[in-house]
Structures are given as C-alpha cells and as structure tokens.
Amino acid sequence: MPEYKKRELKFIGSALKDLKQFPGKVKREVGFDLDMVQSGETPATAKSLTGLSGVMELVERYNKDTYRAVYVANIGGVVYVLHCFKKKSKQGIKTPKEDIDLIRQRLRQAKEEEKRS
C-alpha cells in the first residue's frame, strides 16, 4: 500500500488564535479531524458550506454550543483553515453573513498565497 504524504496545514488570519479559544475537548476533536483532512480523508463531522465551492466546515457540539472550523483542501495540495468560530445564532443552522463574508475574504487570501508560492 503506497504511503500518503500528509498535506501541509496553514491557518489564515486569526483562525489559529480563534481555534485556541475553543474548549479543550473541541480543540482535540477539530485537531483530529484536520489531521484526517491532511491525510486525504473526510471526517464524519465535515459538511460542504453552501454557496462556496470546495469549502468545508467541521461542526462540533459541546455543552449546548456549536463550534465550527471552516477549511478548504483543494488549493495547491494545502489544507487552509479559513475561520474558526462559535456559532452565536440561536435560530436555524444558517451561517451568519458576517462569517460568510470573512470566509470569502480569507478564501481569496489563501488563493493569493498559493499563487505566490
């Protein structure tokens, strides 16, 4: 069986700082899931983010709160973590517009970074 080379993991903007603010159990779960993504697998907690092609989100629930880590894995063989946040909305599952706007901005940054390398 051929050995799969792990993809590099890069955080855009404040994504790493924001992830570090998550509760310990959530950080471990997200870290494990991102390790799976780096290895070419799709975690069970991953789902496609509506309206943004190729952008995925990891959803973790903890103590009645929902934490999300948004990433893209189809840019130059690198896994870019675009945004990590605690969902604040009490109604519905829709991602707030300000978070979507930030994700779009960081996706552009990731694409620009890939062009430079």
Provide a role label for each language-model segment.
Residues 1-66, 75-78, 88-117:
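Basic, Lys/Arg-enriched alpha-helical interface segments
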Residues 80-83:
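Conserved catalytic cores of phosphodiester-cleaving nucleases, focusing on short active-site segments
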Residues 69-71:
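Hydrophobic/aromatic beta-strand elements that line small-molecule binding cavities or substrate pockets
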